[in-house]
């Protein structure tokens, strides 16, 4: 009798654990601009373009690198300051790699700013599987990429080549796919990216001037990529980024794509 009772308890516990695991969801926290903290279903933490401390629209309560907690991986789409942001400090602090365009990481290594183990090389079309069930693919973006850094030799601010800009397709443990576009203008291969990778969620820049404006972003979303959901980003952090979520939503018109109503500091689960 006791044996049957113990077996029943074990089976019940196994069933409960399975339900709990099935209920795990990924969580995406938006700091502002293109900076996100992605926590996967299995609890791995990925930072994307972590411009946090210097970003004017990041909520004050989030301007604390210690409050991020653990970090397992950092993705950087290109070398501009509003994307590489706090990546170097966070990489060293947590002893985790920065995955970025090969030319960007090569420059950091050549200048002696980062140890080789923290700046592995990767390029467009490259795929990494850093954790069980998680796959990250580097894809094209249409932008530029350079870094303004202090030259170790002269001590002067100097502009350095930082590879070519990219975006990332992040596939999570349950198959959910996120396409972080980085900074980009319109380009025809967005259609191929949409057809081939079939992203569920699109993180899309809408501010204009340096990236797509709301009209261009809506065309990319609705006609080329066709995700299930869209998260407008990269606007209002300086006077030239004039595009707004309202303009983007208007340009989208009637659509089955869910346009997320989000502001810096918001979290969503998927």
Which residues does each PLM region occupy?
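Pre-active-site segment of Zn-dependent metallo-hydrolases
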Residues: 40-81, 85-92, 106, 115, ...
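Beta-strand-turn-beta hairpins that frame and shape the catalytic cleft
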Residues: 23-26, 40-46, 127-137, 171-178, ...
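Extracytoplasmic
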Residues: 31-33, 41, 69, 93, ...
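Active-site environment of divalent metal-dependent phosphoester hydrolases
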Residues: 54-55, 81-85, 105-108, 126-128, ...
């Amino acid at each position: 009798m006791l044996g049957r009772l113990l077996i029943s308890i074990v089976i019940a516990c196994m069933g409960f654990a399975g339900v709990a695991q099935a209920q795990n969801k990924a969580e995406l926290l938006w700091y502002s601009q293109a900076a996100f903290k992605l926590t996967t279903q299995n609890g791995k933490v990925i930072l994307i373009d972590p411009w946090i401390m210097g970003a004017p629209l990041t909520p004050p309560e989030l301007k604390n690198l210690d409050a991020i907690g653990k970090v397992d991986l950092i993705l950087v789409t290109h070398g501009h300051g509003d994307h590489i942001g706090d990546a170097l400090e966070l990489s060293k602090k947590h002893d985790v790699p920065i995955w970025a365009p090969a030319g960007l990481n090569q420059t950091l290594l050549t200048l002696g700013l980062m140890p080789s183990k923290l700046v592995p090389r990767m390029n467009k079309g490259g795929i990494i599987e850093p954790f069980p069930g998680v796959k990250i693919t580097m894809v094209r973006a249409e932008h530029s990429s350079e870094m303004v850094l202090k030259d170790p030799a002269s001590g002067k601010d100097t502009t350095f080549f930082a590879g070519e800009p990219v975006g990332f397709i992040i596939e999570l443990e349950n198959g959910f796919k996120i396409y972080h576009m980085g900074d980009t203008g319109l380009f025809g291969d967005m259609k191929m990216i949409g057809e081939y990778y079939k992203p569920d969620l699109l993180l899309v820049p809408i501010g204009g001037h340096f990236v797509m404006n709301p009209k261009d972003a809506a065309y990319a979303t609705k006609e080329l990529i066709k995700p299930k959901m869209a998260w407008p980003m990269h606007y209002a952090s300086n006077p030239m980024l004039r595009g707004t979520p309202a303009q983007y939503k208007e340009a989208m018109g009637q659509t089955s794509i869910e346009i997320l109503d989000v502001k810096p500091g918001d979290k969503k689960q998927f």
